Amino acid sequence: MKTAMDMMKLEEKIRAKTCEYGLKLYAESLQRVADETPRVGSDGKCLTQGRMQDALVRTPYGTVHVRAFCGRCAASGRFEVPFKETYCRGSRFAMTPLMERRVAVTTCETGSFEKCERLCAEWGCPVSDDKAMDLVRDLGGSCLDSDLPPLCKDAAGTEDVLIVSLDGWEGRFRGERWGEKEECRDGHVDWHDIKSAVMYRLSQVADISAGRRTIVTKHIVCVPPNTTPEAFAKKVEREAERMGMLRAAKVYFIMDGATYLWNIFDVHFSSCANGTLDYYHAVQHLAALADALFAGEKDPGPRREWLDRQCHELKSIGPKTLLETIRAIDWKGIRRREARKTAKREAAYFLSHEDHMDYGGNAALGVPIGSGAMESQCSQNQNRFKRRGQFWSDEGFAAFIEVYARYTNGELKYCFSRRMAA
């Protein structure tokens, strides 16, 4: 009786024959492309001291040998192979664009470059982890915003509601003293804030079970470490416009209380969007205010009752009751100095967000009152970029995060457009 193992062996034979035939077609096609590639260098001028050489190119079916022209570039002084420079990034370990894309996608979906190496070997195209890393670095460096279309494929239309949320997460980087002896640990590791954003159409939120929802399609923004708030704001503004911000029926920004985030909103988006303070973040500040107002009370009942009432009314009808309560506070009645200081700080916080707490109105329209989508995206980002043993260089992280964002947004193909058009 035949077993599943026998079937697997049969499948392997069929796959081997298919790859053999596909590799033959690849070799013929790539040779024609190499023969037709203009013999000009990176400076656009004809190459000198020309000769033919063997070029090894990795494809999804295996390695192909191609005879390609090689010549000396007058501007750079180095020998160039136009075929590889145009289509295969010019490296000694050349890959076709489709092979590059598969390796890049595998790198984004797996937890490490080592896992990418193992998975590539499993589907028949061995690539070492360092070569995958080099590819991602090179690919990320070639990504330019000018290559992207004016509008994303999932951009909001004139009847859509666009949701935008901003936040940040901590990334782990190699410090100035990375690699020094074990006893000198200070300065080995640096932690940097990675500013990020997620945007989506409200119509793309789907219920998957009672109390659980998911976002079908979304668009993310991630910037390298040490990016200034202003540079981050311009990046978010550009991507929000590509997501249809200027033509959407309504736009909502939902964020926690970080000062720099609301400065970004006030300067760049307040004229075209509604701002919402994350409800659960507001509740944390309400709890701090309750602690200050009821400081010294032995019975926790009044504090709990006051906090429950304020949270309920804030969520259902908005900030009116809370703001009236704050404005009626008898500051002299709070005898403890630290409690009075805390109460004033929290009161000022809520007064500054008076226009950002219409939770009842949001709920009536189906608009989220919390930034859970952003928290989820931060978790997903960290699941790839902050795993055990991962310590990034600034340059490597910047390149990879760009590739990762392009892949998540379904726009990885635009990383190839400039080189292919050369």
Positions of the model-derived regions?
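N-terminal juxtadomain amphipathic helix
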Residues: T37-F69
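Catalytic center-proximal scaffold of phosphoryl-transfer enzymes
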Residues: M1-A27, C70-A422
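Sterically constrained small-residue positions within well-ordered secondary structures
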Residues: R32, T48, V64, A155-G157, ...
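Extended, Lys/Arg-enriched charged tracts that mediate electrostatic binding to polyanionic substrates
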Residues: S29-V40, C46-Q49, D160, F173-R174
